[in-house]
Amino acid sequence: MKKIFLLMSVVILAAACKSAPVATGPEDNSGFKTTEANNQNAKGLNLPDGASVRETPRGKVLVLHDPKSKADVGKPGSTYEVKFGFDNTIEIGTYKDAYNLVYQIINNNSGIRIISEGHSSKEGPAPYNYKLSQRRSDKSYNYIIKLGVENSRLLKNAFGEALPEYPTLKENRRSEFIIIMTEDDLKKYNDFAKTVDINKETN
């Protein structure tokens, strides 16, 4: 009987660990309140020139356009991005510009929070890729904190290989930044995260 109970406990634990955890931050995040009166939708955001928002099922993803790029908006090379090398947490490309813009957006919008969100390509086992994406999320989170952002303004989460939103492996090794303007935004994000199976191998 004891063996059966232990086996059932393991099965329940495994099932509980399949979905991505909700966005987390420091303990004092509970004291931060979004200003819904001033931020009813993305149009209420104070964004720098070139920055925009991409609406997704999980929320508002920041798109940081590179004003120096000759590529058409939405095409590879047209944006500041936080990308990573294969199987590591070393940023490549225009990551410093991306981090600086995120910092600027947080400072210019007192009623928002940002989620630092880590991702990976599908190379390797999904559970390993999830851990890798957690480290990438941490790396981006810590960089922005060091720029001077209060930690109550920043959250973090990771999805491993579960959200391959870009056509190439290289593009999916990334951090993205989600804007949280209201408590409803955060609930929407966390509800979405609970539906994602982070242990499922991506085809």
Spans of features found by a protein language model:
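Positively charged n-region of N-terminal signal peptides that target proteins for export
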Residues: 1-4
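C-terminal motif of bacterial Sec signal peptides marking the signal peptidase cleavage site
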Residues: 15-16
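Sec-dependent N-terminal signal peptides
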Residues: 6-9
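Periplasmic OmpA-like peptidoglycan-binding domain that tethers envelope proteins to the cell wall
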Residues: 120-193
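Periplasmic peptidoglycan-binding/tethering modules of Gram-negative envelope proteins
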Residues: 20-112, 181-203
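Residues at or immediately flanking beta-strands
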Residues: 111-115, 153-155
